[in-house]
Amino acid sequence: MRKWVSSTVALLVSVLTFYGCGGGGQQSAVPRNRTFIADCSNQQDCSGQFKDYASFNPFLLTGTTKTGWNFAYEPLYFYNAYDEGGDNIIPWIATGHEYNSDYTAVTVSIREGVEWSDGQPWTAHDLVFTINMLRDHAPSLSFSTDMQAWVKNATAVDDYTAQIELTASNPRFIFSYFTNNFDNGIPIMPKHIWEDKDPESFSNFDMAQGWPVVSGPYKMAISSPEQRVWDVRSDWWAAKIGFRELPKVERLIYLPYMEESKRVQNIIANAMDTSLDLRPPNIKSIIDANPGVSTWTGKDLPLGYLDWWPVCLGFNNLEPPFNDPEVRRAVNYAINREQLVKIGWQGAGTSSHLPLPNFPPIRTYTDGIQDLIDKYEIGVYDPAKSAEILQRKGWSKDGDGFWNKDGERLTMVVDIFGIFNDLAPVLVAQLKQAGIEASFRLTSDTFTRMAQGTARAYMMGNGGSVRDPYFTLRLYHSRFVQPTGTHAERFWRWSNPEYDAIVDKMGQTSPDDPELQNLFRQAMEIWLSELPSIPLVQWYHRIPQNETYWKNWPTADNAYINSAYWHNTWLLVLLGLEPSQS
């Protein structure tokens, strides 16, 4: 394996020239100690090879790999959830914004001197074009459903002033959609490239024309089935106007998605600089084998940081038998979360009773509903109560100990991503012990199965709230529900009109308003009583940070941002990294 790794690195970064199918001509040599290498984090779209190598449209619901658009298109703001010393908001393309008195409109001020990679100015016209384009193409594009729900119209007052009229009061509109944090943040497109295109089919890729046109400090050099390569560009607007220095990382190479064992071997061999977050035994094996690798917490547990993505057992809530909240509650009683953590993660983690991350700002809300968690017994492991519910619903156990009704067993096939390979076997074993004929599967089309609802059960994180609970609760709003077989932007397919109305009010209520606490409690009373998904564990990012070639990684003591390279804050890490070797 080491031989294979070494030959791969030599092929990619030591030759004088290399070429890419679909675009990218002769490239100058960049030494390994100025090159950053990682694999694609998206199994469905880049396992074996990049399926989107000839496309760069981040709005396609079919999936677009995060191998560029998450740092090539810069936001109005960044948000750092881990810096406890500041206000956490980092102005970027915007210099400020102001709401009207009832939060039904917001005016955004754009920084002068921002440019696209083709030299055209980045203006308010680009922002309003992107917003209106998404609103007008709902629900066919990513982010479009929310824009349709919230935006009446967006206009450019002048090149540096945008005004957005909202359909209702929304004091967190800019933070929710145009402040990059974790996976949140809508990429803003250049109007002069997109305005005469159909965004539902436009590839945004033609390297002969200089596409994609981006605003960030890198230009696409190669995009082929085998790799995606970005090179730093010296004409980045932020360097020209003195806003930021050029990144020291001169070249980024993304390789196709790898199984975790290959990631481990590549990191140990210094053939990669980071990877997708790893399972506890694997991150420890890297730390033990390679003294040049560290983590967010150095060599100390938990070897990572708490992420915003608490994991639930989800269902297609439109389809039987899991469209019945009582059946879902029976499943809840069959799950031993402490055992999940103890066996699946070797004790290196925490269970979760809510779909919300255990961040300090969120705890100011969740601490106040502990009585509801107790009332609905979320986290209670009680197979007898599970059995009582199923018996009452007409199920009885067959000769093999599985629940059966009308000649059919209660089965559950849980679709998973590779990152759940440690938890899923434990979960399935628990469900089997409770009489549910359970299994799990990891397939190349997992994401599609979840999005279309053909996955009747699945493990999935809740990527939403970081400051207040609204953004997670809105993931369960019925406006995202699509029929089984139709691609849905959110997968839960649960509908409750009373819940919708409360969440709509939450969206119109300022996080500073005490009423938000009351609305949160009302919404969670409904959510916990119906349990559209079953909370399992808080999620941790145990990300290896290879310091052989790069230093000044984000850490618990230097928390300038989190270190996930697939997140929409990755640009800040690229700007923070320093060469370890002269």
Report each predicted region and the residues it spans.
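Detector for C-terminal structural segments
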Residues: 40, 67-68, 225-227, 232, ...
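Aromatic- and charge-enriched surface segment that lines or borders ligand/interaction sites
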Residues: 95-140, 157, 163-165, 263-268, ...
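N-terminal lobe/hinge region of extracytoplasmic solute-binding protein
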Residues: 39-101, 132, 213
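Extracellular/periplasmic solute-recognition and catalytic clefts
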Residues: 134-137, 141, 153-154, 221-231, ...
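Ligand-site clamp/hinge motif
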Residues: 111, 206-208, 236-289, 428, ...
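Gly/Pro-rich hinge or "lid" segments in bacterial periplasmic/extracellular proteins
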Residues: 78-84, 182-246, 251, 261-262, ...
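Surface-exposed binding/hinge segments that line
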Residues: 145-197, 548, 556
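Alpha-helical secondary-structure segments
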Residues: 37, 123-130, 159-165, 216-217, ...
